[in-house]
């Protein structure tokens, strides 16, 4: 570190005035002190000059060292550039070699694709031929089923016609029975009404005759009693007449008046009594007869109500029969429509199953062929690559780079192969699930599996175990 300066700048430049005193005015001691200070400053300046000179030499030395290092680095950089140019030239040569190899590989790949397409065309033709044969057999089965369906429809029509005739006969028989029962009930109750009316008339006449006889007897008895009373009174008056004629005459007159009044009153009383009796007893009997008639009338009304209810039930039964006929016709139409829909669904379902089975079988075959071709191509490429590596005599660095690239290519190819295997497993699983669903639907519709006309083929990849879950959840094949 450079030493610090002491003193003032004004003193270094000149001592025109030193401590407020001119040099010529200083004393000897002051001049000596001033000289000592100047010497100290001179020594200090020398030390600083030496320090800065050392610093300059050190910096110059560092600069020389740095310049030499820079020249060395530039030389190394030029060497690296030359090495990079040489490596680029070698890389271009390797690229040309690999491009030539890739051309050969593409040519072989195109040849393999042409072979695969040819094989696929042959397989497609065979599948189409088999499909035509199956279609002919299915059409033949459909014709047989249509004939059977027509025969069944004719048999059903005959059965329905017989049922209708039988039903019409039963309805006619029931109507005749109801009409006969109605006529019998009407005749029965008309006869009962006539008998009841005759009986009531006879009873009324008999009771009237009995009342007349009873009233006539009462009138005769009453007249006889009156005659006896009159005879007694007459004898009494005759006895009195013997004693007192005047009294008798007066009594006769009174008696005559009394007799007339009595006769008049008796006649009125007899008439009133007769009228009361004649009215009271017939009224009572009439009330009893009326209650009896009301009871019988109630029975008759109840019978009439039963008859009306029977007629109403007959009408309701006829209406229900008519409704049942209409519902029977509707159900027949719906049955025919459901049968047609069932046949159509069965036909579509069978066609869809056959189409899916053919597609999945063909797709499985194509995928297996692709896998075999890819495996063969990979093995062939490995052999060619080993031959090329053996013949090229590359350095270890380039060989490592090429090996790494080849491993990447092989890894991508293996990934493609695994994806294809997974797709094949998923398609096989979907096909098998579709077969299970198809069998379940056939059993739900009541169609035995033996009547399908063909045996569904379950697909499986050789050497692989497929998952047992749904087709969308197929695990990676093992």
Curated annotation (Swiss-Prot):
Residues 1-12 have a biased composition (Basic residues). Residues 1-114 are annotated as: Regulates microtubule-binding. Residues 357-478 are annotated as: Interaction with SMO. Residues 1-32 are annotated as: Disordered. The lineage of its organism: Eukaryota, Metazoa, Chordata, Craniata, Vertebrata. It comes from the Eukaryota. Residues 115-258 are annotated as: Microtubule-binding. The keyword Coiled coil applies. Belongs to the DRC4 family. It comes from Rattus norvegicus. Component of the nexin-dynein regulatory complex (N-DRC), a key regulator of ciliary/flagellar motility which maintains the alignment and integrity of the distal axoneme and regulates microtubule sliding in motile axonemes. Plays an important role in the assembly of the N-DRC linker. Plays dual roles at both the primary (or non-motile) cilia to regulate hedgehog signaling and in motile cilia to coordinate cilia movement. Required for proper motile cilia functioning. Keywords: Cell projection, Cilium, Coiled coil, Cytoplasm, Cytoskeleton, Flagellum, Golgi apparatus, Microtubule. It is found in: Cytoplasm; Cytoplasm, Cytoskeleton; Cell projection, Cilium, Flagellum; Cytoplasm, Cytoskeleton, Cilium axoneme. Residues 24-201, 243-427 form a coiled coil. This is Dynein regulatory complex subunit 4. Component of the nexin-dynein regulatory complex (N-DRC). Interacts with microtubules. Interacts with SMO. Interacts (via coiled-coil domains) with RAB3B (in GTP-bound form). Interacts with DRC1. Interacts with DRC7.
